[in-house]
């Protein structure tokens, strides 16, 4: 499964690579990283239909994760990738907006990697 992680905090890449070391080594999961919404859209345009799942932070400078979500769900229709939103703020407003825009799931930081692995394995 190819997963695109979108977060403006670059240390997220190291964290995911450590937490999913076994899955990456076995080829079960492959991660790519974008550090802004704009970079994520460029990646999706260059690798259309490759990312099956997108994990996106909500609060990023420039294009927010919610803006990115809206563009993904309207542009990539056949079928759009699964999008899980990640935020440090688990408030109802962000949750409701994300759901209205088509988010498939919603996680709060700090990410519970055991829970995330379980969710990802159900999609494989």
Segments (PLM) and residue ranges:
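Alpha4 helix (beta4-alpha4-beta5 surface) of REC/receiver domains from two-component response regulators
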Residues: 67, 79, 90-105, 118
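Short amphipathic alpha-helix used as the core "switch/output" element in two-component signaling
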Residues: 42, 66-79
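A Lys-centered signature of the CheY-like receiver
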Residues: 8, 109
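Two-component/phosphorelay signaling modules centered on CheY-like receiver
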Residues: 10-32
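C-terminal output helix
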Residues: 111-120
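Receiver (REC) domain active-site loop signature in two-component systems and cognate sites
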Residues: 60
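Active-site residues of response regulator receiver
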Residues: 7, 57, 87
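Helix N-cap/capping motif at the beta->alpha junctions
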Residues: 33-42, 65
């Amino acid at each position: 499964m190819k997963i695109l992680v979108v977060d403006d905090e670059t240390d997220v890449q190291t964290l995911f690579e450590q937490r999913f070391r076994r899955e990456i080594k076995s080829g079960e999961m492959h991660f790519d990283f974008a550090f802004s919404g704009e970079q994520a859209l460029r990646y999706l345009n260059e690798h259309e239909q490759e990312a099956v799942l997108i994990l996106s932070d909500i609060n990023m400078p420039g294009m927010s994760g919610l803006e990115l979500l809206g563009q993904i769900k309207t542009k990539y229709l056949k079928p759009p990738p699964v999008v899980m939103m990640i935020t440090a703020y688990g408030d109802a407003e962000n949750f409701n907006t994300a759901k209205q825009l088509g988010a498939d799931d919603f996680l709060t930081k700090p990410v519970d990697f055991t829970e995330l692995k379980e969710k990802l394995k159900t999609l494989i």
